[in-house]
């Protein structure tokens, strides 16, 4: 495939390995195991086990680095076509233009040639050194220097300064600056100051100061420039090397100096070490042509003051350039400076991991125009190689490469004192796969190098982004490398096996010859990137892989590899060397010698260091070191022999390991010497290895001498120690083989075998098959000894030994054979033989006893016990055990079935049958089993009968159950269901006794007692006739209570029936009443005992109930009086809002009532919102027709308001209550509610009698007569157009005239004085009556009667007591009208009631219309919908949260249940019989009530019968 092709074909995948946990525990062992397969590919990938996930240990916040800049299109088209000269020679510029996609024609090739020659070609000439060929070079500018190796190792490593910690000597000193020569400040040195060398012009060579002005002969400089500080160093051979001390480039130096505020008089210089050289005579002649003519064309170098004709330079310059100019030699010298990074330039910005990741992800997302995680790896790979080959697109990326882990921290946990590690981190910190640990493992060669070689022993970190790449290279010293990707996107690798390394180098040289001509070791500089397809097209085998997070990639010795990153990631890499690497390491040194490349460490020193301590070496490593050492000694002998043949006999010992690396390097091949080197007395600054003895110097051989580390006699001694160490395994293996095979006929003792195993462990022999056999033999022998000791101790333990640990007779014999076959002697064999003899004797005795059956059970049992003490299972012992078990089973059956024995359970019987199946068969056993089975069958049948009786829905009478129990008594088995049936029958008898006792008592039974008996009777599995009677009584009692509840309780009432019937116990506490009203949970109501203050036992005594009720009446009255005083002291909501008081009224809604719309309760004197409570209706009284009935007076309007806290029930009429009492008399059950109802009735009748008595007084009768006369006079007078006014009589009621036709309709809607109006019964147009009432209010005057205080006070007290009664009485209404007539009309309340009624009617009509529309829509759709909910038609107060708002509907239901008994009516109007009686006198009307047809005396005997012991004065 051509390099310029757009399609990239991925190479085949490299091998991928997934080790098991057992394999993964030995890293280098596993790598050695896969090496035969993976080495053929050069690289491989290893996926650790899924559970191996090391934590990321880098301190992210403190991790800062500066990446390198990479440009992807470094190999360009011209280089690919063979270079500038080749293209010009073959006239291929048109081909170049075609490859650059320019259109043919138009002389594009010529234009490209001119641009290339002007811009790029000078750089290529500089790179190749062609512009220095004709230069009259100084002695150091020779050909050898041009090809001298540029120190870089991997160049990126060289650009990073070594660690501040223990650096390995050679590398650390190589990168450290030379020892600083003496520096002098010219200003401070008077001798130097006299020289006056500040201006332009030639300077003395010895001072090393150069003139800055390159246009020396032109005087057009605009101002003085500060000359750069330069250093002239004299080399050992008299050479002079000019170096700039500034690390910046020339342009940067110029820019910095031109802006520097420092004066141009301060210089730093280095004094020469040797002043014996001849003085340099400066002349203004061209260094190329050695002529001085045409001085206007002479160009002065700003670095070395050499002169050049601009036309002599290659390529020539058209004119003298402006600014700083350096000659080719100075440019070459500057570029050869070791401290400068070769390869990719360093970026200027410092990144953190977060900022670099944001930059990397942003770049990739912008470049690919899609999310970074969605870009396919194949697409990135193709795009990368397209960009590498492209010259049109200049894509620049940054790569955080070669970051020193010692300074920035490793990605793996490291065991150091900086921070405490968790147990999980500690595990990974010591793992062999931790890249900080792997290079220094015991099997690794690098662990024998003390110094931390950066990049080899100390890992480096790599932070990559998309397209950031690493070029084709092999590792230093051809070592292994391992790379772990901690996290991030994949890293793509390409690898070439070591067998094809030279082939790859040849292809590279063939494709880019110019680069390799100038730099033979180009592939060692990590700056060469070539398309894998190009290599494959030339026959180089290439493999690839994508390394994902958590995976390892291993490169093998001399395996070329390269790759790039798919995106933002973080990797870590390190080198390691194993025993198999040693031959490759030696070959690498020879290869470095040919390339004159520096070594990272001395291979000879490493071998000798390992050979000096052979006992510390791994056995395989010792064998490999011995082999390498032998080759090295042979070569050393040959080289030293060549020295003798040359006549060099002088020698001295030298500890080369103590010398810095740069002081023991061969000046020819740059190899680091260790075993020996050749030096010269006259040239002390240089030495050579023994392979280049002819390249040291020109001095005589007599002046040269050998510097050696070891003598030729010491090297064989070291070699011998290695051999002993390497062959020690063979000696040991021979001993082990003889011991295991018993070749000499003598079994070794256990101690001898343990000594051999201990020797292998101490000398770290490899885990071979022979060692495993020895360990297995020892393990087996120790197990046999332990088992034999256990056998002996088991006999001593006797019957207390664990049964599961016994061995069989066959196992005992096999165990003895095993001990005899082991290759070691054990004295426990005799003990085992003795036990075997005892067991065989016992076996013979047991056989004899079994042959003479039936034997006595005692004899069999004794034999069995003796066998157990032996500790060995004998087959005959099992037969003895079965015979003993048979005898025991028969005895147990006999005891169980004996008549005198305790009855056994069914489980016991079944257990005996199951156990009998496992005993030895015999006729006696069969007979016993048959008897057991028959008995068990009968018992189960009766048990099933009892179970059916207990579980059946149809309960059986007690007589039936008694018969079943009697028949089951004859079975000698304990039957649980029969026993349960007995217990149920006993409970039934006890229950019947309790029923008889409670029914025959002095009093009727209480409902709670009956309910308890019913609940118990229902749970009994016995048919009870009495239960049905009790259930009927309880049902009747519940029905009566439900009927009473409907009569008294409002819908959703928060009170219980008993609470309503009893006096209000908390009438004096406003807060308690109010909180009770707000309570919605019925489960929190007070119990009966709390209401009456009696115990459960006292509630069964009717006398106690009556006494408690009487006490409750008194407490209720006292409480309400206290509450009235408290509430009267509260400010009125109708008063001024500025009135401030700590005690304010609170409505049932929880808010403070204020302003118009507030009503005051006539009983408790508290204030409420009119919209939150049920209010009276003004026109609640029935009306005559306009022609027959007079108008009502204002005192007859219904303005009386009782709050829901005082009016707790519906307050039925006395007639309804008497009907309930009649039904109660027929109940044979006592209820707390019934007795409370009797007390309430007696209290109401008592109050009614007192009220009638008060109304019958003469003064009261006279007042009532006046009201009757006034009513008659109003009836007889004609109706005027305007309502008349009178000072002492009530105003006429225009509503009675104008809307008399509507009164029957209104009367039908008003029940019990309640204000609830049903929208079905009110026409939408009604409302004129309310308007008439509103217009009449300003003309109302009063009072119409004058009530003396002596008359008013008793009536008000009676009114108070009557309002406390939860019963409606006509006398209450009469007293109310009389009191109202004696007071002025309450206009504020009347207005409030009118406004509330108007608002209510308006809301009812709106809801009625909406409901009618909904009903019509449903009918139109054809659906048969139910009638809308009643709550939707009721007014706002009905739908409120207060239960009283919905009592109207329940009152209608109450009428139907009580036979048409309606709510209480007010005092009859004129024209009725009662009115006629009142006109003639009130006495007849007060003498009888509408409900007096049922005298109370007929009801009281029930209550009196309940308490015959009470004295007459306490009875009602």
Swiss-Prot record:
Its main location: nucleus. It is an enzyme of class 1 (oxidoreductase). A zinc finger (PHD-type) spans 283-333, 1144-1209. The keyword Cell wall biogenesis/degradation does not apply. Binds 1 Fe(2+) ion per subunit. Residues 1404-1419 have a biased composition (Basic residues). Fe cation binds at residues 473, 475, 561. Residues 156-166, 1471-1481, 1489-1500 have a biased composition (Polar residues). Residues 142-186, 216-262, 1274-1305, 1400-1516 are annotated as: Disordered. It catalyses: N(6),N(6),N(6)-trimethyl-L-lysyl(4)-[histone H3] + 3 2-oxoglutarate + 3 O2 = L-lysyl(4)-[histone H3] + 3 formaldehyde + 3 succinate + 3 CO2. Residues 142-151, 232-242, 1294-1304, 1420-1437 have a biased composition (Basic and acidic residues). PROSITE patterns: ARID, JMJC, JMJN, ZF_PHD_1, ZF_PHD_2. One of its GO terms (molecular function) is DNA binding. InterPro entries: ARID_dom, ARID_dom_sf, JmjC_dom, JmjN, KDM5_C-hel, Lys_sp_deMease-like_dom, Zinc_finger_PHD-type_CS, Znf_C5HC2. A zinc finger (C5HC2) spans 666-718. Signal peptide: none annotated. Histone demethylase that specifically demethylates 'Lys-4' of histone H3, thereby playing a central role in histone code. Does not demethylate histone H3 'Lys-9', H3 'Lys-27', H3 'Lys-36', H3 'Lys-79' or H4 'Lys-20'. Demethylates trimethylated and dimethylated but not monomethylated H3 'Lys-4'. Participates in transcriptional repression of neuronal genes by recruiting histone deacetylases and REST at neuron-restrictive silencer elements. Belongs to the JARID1 histone demethylase family. The first PHD-type zinc finger domain recognizes and binds H3-K9Me3. Both the JmjC domain and the JmjN domain are required for enzymatic activity. Part of two distinct complexes, one containing E2F6, and the other containing REST. Interacts with ZMYND8. This is Lysine-specific demethylase 5C. It comes from Sus scrofa. The lineage of its organism: Eukaryota, Metazoa, Chordata, Craniata, Vertebrata.
């Amino acid at each position: 495939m051509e390099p310029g092709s757009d399609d990239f074909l991925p190479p085949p995948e490299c091998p991928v390995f997934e080790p098991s946990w057992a394999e993964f525990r030995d890293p280098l062992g596993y790598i050695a195991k896969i090496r035969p397969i993976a080495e053929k590919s050069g690289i491989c990938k290893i996926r650790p086990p899924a559970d191996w996930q090391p934590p990321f240990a880098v301190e992210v916040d403190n991790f800062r680095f500066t990446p390198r800049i990479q440009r992807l299109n470094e190999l360009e088209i011209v280089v690919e076509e063979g270079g500038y000269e080749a293209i010009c020679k073959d006239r291929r510029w048109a081909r170049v233009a075609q490859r650059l996609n320019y259109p043919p024609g138009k002389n594009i090739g010529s234009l490209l040639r001119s641009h290339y020659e002007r811009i790029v070609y000078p750089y290529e000439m500089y790179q190749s050194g062609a512009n220095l060929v004709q230069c009259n070079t100084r002695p150091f500018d020779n050909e050898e220097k041009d090809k001298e190796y540029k120190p870089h190792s991997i160049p990126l490593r060289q650009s990073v300064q070594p660690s501040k910690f223990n650096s390995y000597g050679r590398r650390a000193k190589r990168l450290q600056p030379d020892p600083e020569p003496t520096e002098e400040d010219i200003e401070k040195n008077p001798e130097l100051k006299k020289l006056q060398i500040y201006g332009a012009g030639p300077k003395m060579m010895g001072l090393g100061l150069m003139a800055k002005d390159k246009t020396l002969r032109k005087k057009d400089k605009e101002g003085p420039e500060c000359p750069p500080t330069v250093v002239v160093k004299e080399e050992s051979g008299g050479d002079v090397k000019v170096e700039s001390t500034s690390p910046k480039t020339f342009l940067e130096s110029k820019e910095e100096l031109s802006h520097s505020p420092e004066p141009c008089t301060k210089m730093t210089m280095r004094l020469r070490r040797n002043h014996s050289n001849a003085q340099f005579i400066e002349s203004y002649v061209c260094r190329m042509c050695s002529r001085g003519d045409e001085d206007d064309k002479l160009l002065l170098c700003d670095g070395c003051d050499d002169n050049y004709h601009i036309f002599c330079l290659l390529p020539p310059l058209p004119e003298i350039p402006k600014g700083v100019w350096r000659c080719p030699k100075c440019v070459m010298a500057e570029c050869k400076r070791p401290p400068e990074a070769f390869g990719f330039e360093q970026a200027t910005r410092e990144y953190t991991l977060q900022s670099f990741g944001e930059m990397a992800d942003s770049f990739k997302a912008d470049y690919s125009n899609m999310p970074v995680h969605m870009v396919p790896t194949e697409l990135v790979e193709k795009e990368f190689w397209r960009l590498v080959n492209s010259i049109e697109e200049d894509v620049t990326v940054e790569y955080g490469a070669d970051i020193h882990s010692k300074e920035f921290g490793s990605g793996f946990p490291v065991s150091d004192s900086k921070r405490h590690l968790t147990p999980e981190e500690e595990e990974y910190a010591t793992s062999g796969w931790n890249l900080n640990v792997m290079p220094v493992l015991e099997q690794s060669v690098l662990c024998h190098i003390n110094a931390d070689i950066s990049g080899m022993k100390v890992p480096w970190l790599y932070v990559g982004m998309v397209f950031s790449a690493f070029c084709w290279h092999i590792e230093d010293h051809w070592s292994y490398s391992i790379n772990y990707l901690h996290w991030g996107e994949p890293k793509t690798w390409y690898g070439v096996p070591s067998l094809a390394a030279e082939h790859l180098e040849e292809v590279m040289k063939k494709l880019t010859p110019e680069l390799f001509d100038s730099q033979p070791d180009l592939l060692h500089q990590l700056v060469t990137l070539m398309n894998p397809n190009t290599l494959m097209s030339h026959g180089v085998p290439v493999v690839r892989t994508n390394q994902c997070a958590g995976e390892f990639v291993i490169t093998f010795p001399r395996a070329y590899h390269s790759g790039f990153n798919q995106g933002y990631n973080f990797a870590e890499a390190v080198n390691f060397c194993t025993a198999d690497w040693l031959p490759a390491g030696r070959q690498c040194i020879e290869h470095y010698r040919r390339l004159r490349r520096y070594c990272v460490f001395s291979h000879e020193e490493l071998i000798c260091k390992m050979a000096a301590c052979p006992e510390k070496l791994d056995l395989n490593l010792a064998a490999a070191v011995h082999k390498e050492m032998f080759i090295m000694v042979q070569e050393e002998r040959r080289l030293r022999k060549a020295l003798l043949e040359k006549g060099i006999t002088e020698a001295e010992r030298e500890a080369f390991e103590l010398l810095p690396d740069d002081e023991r390097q061969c000046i020819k091949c740059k190899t680091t010497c260790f075993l020996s080197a050749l030096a010269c007395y006259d040239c002390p600054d240089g030495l050579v290895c023994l392979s280049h003895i002819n390249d040291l110097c020109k001095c005589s051989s007599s002046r040269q001498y050998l510097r050696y580390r070891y003598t030729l006699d010491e090297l064989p001694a070291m070699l011998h120690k290695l051999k002993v160490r390497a062959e020690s395994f063979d000696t040991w293996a021979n001993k082990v083989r003889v011991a295991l095979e018993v070749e000499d006929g003598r079994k070794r003792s256990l101690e001898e075998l343990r000594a051999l195993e201990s020797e292998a462990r101490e000398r770290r022999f490899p885990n071979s098959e022979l060692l495993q056999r020895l360990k297995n033999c020892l393990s087996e022998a120790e197990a046999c000894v332990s088992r034999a000791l256990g056998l002996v101790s088991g006999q001593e333990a006797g019957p207390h030994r664990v049964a599961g640990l016994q061995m069989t007779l066959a196992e005992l014999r096999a165990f003895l054979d095993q001990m005899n076959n082991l290759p070691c002697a054990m004295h426990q064999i005799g003990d085992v033989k003795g036990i075997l003899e005892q067991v065989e004797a016992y076996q013979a005795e047991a056989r004899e006893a079994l042959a003479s059956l039936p034997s006595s059970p005692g004899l069999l049992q004794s034999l069995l016990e003796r066998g157990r003490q032996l500790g060995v299972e004998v087959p005959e012992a099992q037969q003895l055990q079965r015979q003993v078990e048979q005898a025991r089973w028969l005895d147990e059956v006999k005891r169980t079935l004996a008549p005198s024995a305790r009855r056994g359970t069914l489980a016991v019987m079944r257990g005996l049958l199951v156990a009998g199946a496992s005993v030895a068969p015999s006729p006696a056993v069969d007979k016993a089993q048959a008897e057991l089975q028959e008995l068990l069958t009968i018992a189960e049948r009766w048990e099933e009968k009892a179970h059916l009786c207990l579980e059946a829905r149809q309960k059986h009478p007690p007589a039936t159950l008694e018969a079943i129990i009697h028949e089951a008594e004859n079975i000698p088995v304990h039957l649980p269901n029969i026993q349960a049936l007995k217990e149920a029958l006993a409970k039934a008898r006890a229950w019947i006794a309790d029923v008889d006792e409670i029914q025959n008592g002095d009093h009727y039974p209480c409902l709670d007692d009956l309910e308890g008996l019913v609940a118990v009777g229902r749970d009994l599995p016995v048919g009870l006739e009495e239960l049905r009677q009790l259930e009927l009584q309880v049902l009747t009692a519940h029905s009566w209570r439900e009927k009473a509840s409907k009569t008294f309780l409002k819908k959703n009432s928060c009170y219980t029936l008993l609470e309503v019937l009893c006096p209000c116990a908390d009438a004096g506490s406003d807060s308690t009443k109010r909180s009770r009203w707000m309570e919605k949970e019925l489960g929190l109501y007070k119990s009966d005992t709390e209401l009456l203050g009696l115990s459960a036992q006292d509630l069964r005594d009717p006398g106690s109930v009556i006494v408690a009720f009487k006490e409750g009446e008194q407490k209720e009255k006292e409480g309400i009086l206290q509450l009235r005083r408290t509430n009267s002291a509260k400010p009125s909501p109708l008063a001024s809002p500025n009135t401030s008081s700590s005690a304010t009224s609170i409505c049932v809604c929880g808010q403070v009532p204020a302003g118009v719309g507030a009503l005051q309760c006539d009983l408790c004197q508290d204030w409420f919102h009119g919209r939150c409570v049920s209010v009276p209706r003004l026109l609640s009284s029935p009306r005559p027709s306009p022609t027959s009935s007079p108008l009502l007076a204002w005192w007859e309007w219904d303005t009386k308001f009782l709050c829901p806290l005082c009016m707790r029930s519906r307050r039925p009429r006395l007639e309804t209550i008497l009907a309930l009492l009649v039904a109660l008399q027929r109940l044979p059950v006592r209820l707390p509610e019934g007795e409370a109802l009797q007390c309430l009735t007696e209290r109401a009748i008592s109050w009614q009698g007192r009220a009638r008595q008060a109304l019958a007084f003469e003064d009261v009768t006279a007042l009532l007569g006046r009201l009757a006369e006034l009513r008659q006079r109003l009836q007889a007078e004609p109706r005027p157009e305007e309502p008349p006014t009178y000072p002492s009589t009530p105003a006429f009621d225009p509503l009675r005239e104008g809307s008399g036709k509507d009164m029957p309709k209104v009367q039908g809607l008003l029940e019990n004085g309640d204000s609830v109006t049903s929208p079905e019964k009110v026409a939408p147009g009604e409302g004129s009556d309310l308007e008439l009432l509103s217009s009449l209010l300003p003309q109302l005057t009063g009072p119409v009667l004058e009530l003396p205080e002596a008359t008013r006070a008793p009536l008000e007290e009676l009114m108070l007591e009557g309002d406390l009664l939860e019963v409606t009485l006509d006398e209450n209404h009469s007293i109310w009208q009389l009191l109202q007539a004696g007071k002025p009309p309450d206009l504020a309340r009347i207005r409030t009631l009118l406004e509330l009624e108007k608002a209510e009617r308006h809301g009812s009509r709106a809801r009625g219309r909406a409901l009618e529309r909904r009903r019509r829509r449903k009918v139109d759709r054809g659906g048969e919908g139910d009638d809308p909910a009643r709550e939707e038609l009721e007014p706002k107060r009905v739908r409120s949260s207060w239960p009283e708002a919905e009592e109207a509907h329940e009152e209608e239901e109450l009428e139907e249940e009580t036979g048409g008994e309606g709510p209480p009516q007010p005092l009859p109007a004129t024209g009725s019989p009662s009115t006629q009686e009142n006109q003639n006198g009130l006495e007849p009307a007060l003498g009888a009530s509408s409900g007096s047809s049922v005298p109370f005396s007929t009801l009281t005997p029930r209550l009196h019968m309940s308490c015959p012991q009470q004295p007459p004065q306490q009875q009602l």
